[in-house]
């Protein structure tokens, strides 16, 4: 018999929701800092996170090896993520090795491993969760609209709905 938090994360939306619930322990009941609740994971051996002098980080979980020089709000960043100066990440889940270039805006989305979001690109919005698949590049100035599911790289300046 199981008592406590459980969520099926078999969809993009449910995976995003579960990550957002980790950021809200008062309402979700998830306290990852509770010493009685063990977390079993495979953590890469990486240096500590680096938060740059002009970076802003609010209500977020930032894993080892991340380099934050821009703005990160209410987001979960996995190992080795880079957010360049002038970039904004909000209400997002970024998997290992994601790079968000200067001036890019990433909002309400999941970016899979090793995605590169080019300078000035926009991914997601205020509506349904956007998703960008593993290893893809979103070109500089490109736009990936809210709710889009991207499985091929997006060229510079291109728009994907």
Regions found by a protein language model. Give the residues of each.
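Left-handed beta-helix
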Residues: 1-161
């Amino acid at each position: 018999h199981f008592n406590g938090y459980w969520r099926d994360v078999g969809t993009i939306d449910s995976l995003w929701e579960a990550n957002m619930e980790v950021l809200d322990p008062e309402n979700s009941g998830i306290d990852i800092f509770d010493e009685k609740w063990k977390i079993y994971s495979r953590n890469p051996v990486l240096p500590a996170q680096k938060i740059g002098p002009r970076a802003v980080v609010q209500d977020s979980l930032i894993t080892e090896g991340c380099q934050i020089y821009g703005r990160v709000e209410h987001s979960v960043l996995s190992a080795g993520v880079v957010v360049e100066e002038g970039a904004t990440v909000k209400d997002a889940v970024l998997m290992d090795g994601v790079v968000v270039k200067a001036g890019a805006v990433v909002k309400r989305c999941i970016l899979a491993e090793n995605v590169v979001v080019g300078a000035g690109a926009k991914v997601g919005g205020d509506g349904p969760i956007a998703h960008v698949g593993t290893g893809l590049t979103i070109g500089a100035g490109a736009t990936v609209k809210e709710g889009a599911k991207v499985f091929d790289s997006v060229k510079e300046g291109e728009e994907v709905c």
